[in-house]
Amino acid sequence: MYKAIIIEDEALARQRLMYLLEAHHNNAISIIGESDTGKAGIDMANQTRPDVIFLDVHLPDMYGFDVLKALDIQPMIIFTTAYSDYAVQAFDVFSIDYLVKAF
């Protein structure tokens, strides 16, 4: 089972993503934490050491790309964004995929 955290400032987007992951992946992913800011997300990720991070590109205190650079670990990163034009930039910083928010 993969351990995952969600770093997303929009509560509804966090809830929808958690529902999708928990309801449709037959216990393959366990959500072990969630955060609504980049700083708190960095601290959580470095403490819990997840396998996967679902990371919003635009957070209230920093960009998701800066969160990625500040991590002490190298988990799989899946960026979430409302703008598909961030996809190329996401792949440039070694994310494995991205989700356009509409989930």
Q: Which residues are covered by each model-predicted region?
A:
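Detector for Asparagine
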Residues: N26-N27, K39, N46
